């Protein structure tokens, strides 16, 4: 490597979420640039329907990504809230704690993406780990929830998502790709179970996963 090339590389600090390869058809990671464009559109729509208010300055708004993969939406929402709430909560630690405990929530689509998403928002794959920037979570999930979910088979199809039993009835060693958010008859009760207490989300945003096959 030349001295010039080495200097150029030392000056480059790429966003790690732009450097991760997609894992499968249903784990196509949203580029940060696209996520931010969507959040810009969200802010415009919020202002248009809420008397011109800035969503990023509201400490009561709750956000949910129901199909979290890299955690890019949760991370970028957090970054915007950290800036927007500076006037209301001038102490940075208090501000970050409030945002990540009370405003930003995700439901991961696989075990691997749950770890990746937590790393993106908590700086630790375990929300209550020693490296986590939030010190008061009682579980390793924090507010980025994941647990293995099974399909509900009826006439060779999942009665919730329509997936083929032939394709998706898999062993314990493989992911089921049954997404918890749509595999329930009562999402409000499930959200209360996952995150504790009655939950009401003001914003639901994300990039829904693709299916592994089209049958």
Which residues fall in each region the model found?
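SAM-dependent methyltransferase catalytic region
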Residues: 1-215
């Amino acid at each position: 490597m030349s001295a010039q090339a080495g200097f150029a590389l030392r000056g480059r600090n790429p966003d790690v979420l732009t450097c991760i390869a997609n894992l499968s058809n249903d784990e196509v990671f949203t580029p940060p640039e696209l996520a931010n464009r969507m959040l810009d559109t969200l802010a415009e729509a919020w202002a248009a329907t809420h008397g011109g208010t800035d969503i990023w300055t509201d400490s009561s708004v709750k956000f949910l990504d129901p199909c979290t993969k890299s955690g890019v939406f949760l991370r970028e929402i957090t970054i915007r809230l950290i800036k927007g709430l500076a006037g209301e909560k001038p102490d940075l630690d208090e501000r970050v704690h409030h945002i990540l405990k009370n405003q930003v929530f995700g439901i991961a689509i696989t075990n691997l993406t749950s770890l990746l998403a937590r790393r993106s928002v908590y700086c630790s794959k375990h929300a209550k780990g020693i490296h986590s920037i939030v010190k008061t979570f009682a579980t390793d999930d924090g507010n980025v929830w994941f647990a293995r979910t099974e399909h509900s088979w009826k006439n060779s199809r999942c009665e919730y998502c329509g997936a083929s039993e032939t394709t998706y009835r898999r062993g314990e060693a493989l992911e089921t790709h049954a997404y918890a958010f749509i595999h329930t008859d009562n999402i409000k009760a499930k959200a209360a179970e996952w995150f504790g207490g009655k939950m009401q989300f003001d914003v639901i945003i994300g990039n829904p996963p693709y299916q592994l096959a089209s049958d």
